[in-house]
Amino acid sequence: MDAFKRNLEKLAELAIRVGLNLEKGQEVIATAPIEAVDFVRLLAEKAYREGASLFTVIYGDQELARKRLALAPEEGLDKAPAWLYEGMARAFREGAARLAVSGSDPKALEGLPPEKVGRAQKANARAYKPALEAITEFVTNWTIVPFAHPGWARAVFPGLPEEEAVRRLWEAIFQATRADQEDPIAAWEAHNRALHEKVAYLNARRFHALHFKGPGTDLVVGLAEGHLWQGGATATKGGRLCNPNLPTEEVFTAPHRERVEGVVRASRPLALGGTLVEGIFARFERGFAVEVRAEKGEEVLRRLLDTDEGARRLGEVALVPADNPIAKTGLVFFDTLFDENAASHIAFGQAYQENLEGRPSGEAFRKRGGNESLVHVDWMIGSEEMDVDGLYEDGTRTPLMRRGRWVV
């Protein structure tokens, strides 16, 4: 077996054993780009060897999405397969694991009318809500694992022939996920321990807010009452550990939906449903993004933020060191799974229940500052020029990051 096949086998095994931490007899519901069919078959093989009772896959096709946006009647863009998402949500609540294979062409929908793209995305977000709630509530174990989609490879390595670009992207994936190491599972155990140490430190400090200061950014993010930091392996409501993201370098918590003030600029592009959004700037008052601009893709971003009132508020704040393995590649991946783990970031939209003590829901969740929305969109703000302080309620502060690196 050559090195590529060996690393691909290791990645698939990581997804099932470390990402999902699959339980014997558990069902798996997978979503994947249609180009990933061979990788999905390998994932299914690993899942069945670990005792999966049923592996069901739902494929997505960006070419079909593009044809729909170009040819379907306008009123058809308000439709989405609610029946499918309701079924997925029911399966998750009944114990099925959720496996997402990521990887897509970040430019697949470029050139299409932004109002059409936004309309379809809004309809899909509404229909997907039951499934999103089950995921953000951690009712079951779930993970995201990357696939080197040719369109994605072309975006990351635009000067290379496609075959070489795909090979280089796979190498980056194997490195970032630790699949290229001799014992990837042991490497992940050590990595999870390191992330959990940072989580324990931050949870012990009980900061009132975080202050981000860097070029174009002077932002104070208030933290939700009874907030909890998370990172690495996370427990579901039933107590089963899973690693939601392969790779991951972040520790994250819930902002207070009404206590975000200041200005912030993105440090990396955002791939938003087949459209690249670059140069994002936002100004917050009392937690609400009163001004949002982008140098490219602004209309698609605006339409997403018009989904509901919570879409212009923050649901996540994450700290990521600028000297981690993904950041040190020097690559811009045009993929949230990778770029969010190369830089500190914030997210518009839905907050995670796991980031609040006791995992409250409904009015209790909102009362403590948890944000609710149909969307959850991470965008990157960290860099080697970013400083981050933890602020206490009395105004004193503790340096957490200097020039993008941990100092604690």
UniProtKB/Swiss-Prot annotation:
Cited InterPro entries: M29_Exopeptidase (IPR052170), M29_N-terminal (IPR035097), Peptidase_M29 (IPR000787)
Positions that bind a divalent metal cation 1: 250, 316, 340, 345
Coiled coil segments of this chain: none
Cofactor: binding details: Binds 2 divalent metal cations per subunit. Can use cobalt, zinc, and possibly also magnesium ions.
UniProt key word Chaperone: no
Molecular function via GO: aminopeptidase activity; metal ion binding; metallopeptidase activity
Keywords linked to the UniProt accession: Aminopeptidase, Cobalt, Hydrolase, Metal-binding, Metalloprotease, Protease, Zinc
Requisite cofactors: Co(2+); Zn(2+); Mg(2+)
Superkingdom per UniProt: Bacteria
EC number: 3.4.11.-
GO terms (BP aspect): proteolysis
Function field: Metal-dependent exopeptidase.
PANTHER family associated with the record: AMINOPEPTIDASE, AMINOPEPTIDASE AMPS
Family: Belongs to the peptidase M29 family.
Assembly: Homodimer.
Protein name per Swiss-Prot or TrEMBL: Aminopeptidase T
Record organism: Thermus thermophilus (strain ATCC 27634 / DSM 579 / HB8)
